[in-house]
A protein has these predicted regions:
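A structural signal for short, well-ordered beta-strand segments
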Residues: 6-10, 54-56, 88-90
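A general secondary-structure boundary signal
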Residues: 9, 42-46, 67-72
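A short linear hydrophobic-aromatic micro-motif
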Residues: 38-43, 86-87
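Short, charge-patterned binding micro-sites
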Residues: 41-62
Length: 97
């Protein structure tokens, strides 16, 4: 069993309120959950207007699937025109670790 997670630090475009920020971040998190069947949440910079942290995790039987899903998550977020990915950190462990 493999457990993988990704943490993305993103900058939002022309955002001037937390309400506007949430209107951008929440649909992204919802899309990650729906499309990839992962656990996802806004995890950092909760009080900043133009920054956000998004985390997602997956458990799978093989490493290749975990890598594939984490790649797809990073690409999906990077393709959103209103966000810029500043950093992406990945971690993977096996149940034997």
């Amino acid at each position: 069993m493999w457990i993988g997670w990704i943490e993305l630090d993103i900058r939002l475009g022309d955002v001037h309120s937390l309400k506007t920020k949430r209107s951008i971040v929440r649909p992204i998190v919802t899309e990650l959950r729906r499309r990839f069947q992962v656990t996802a949440a806004e995890t950092a910079h909760l009080d900043k207007h133009r920054r956000a942290g998004i985390g997602a995790s997956i458990v799978a039987a093989d490493r290749a699937h975990v890598v594939e899903v984490l790649d797809a998550i990073e690409q999906l977020i990077a393709y959103h025109p209103e966000v810029e990915v500043l950093a992406a950190r990945r971690h993977m462990v096996t149940a034997d670790d």
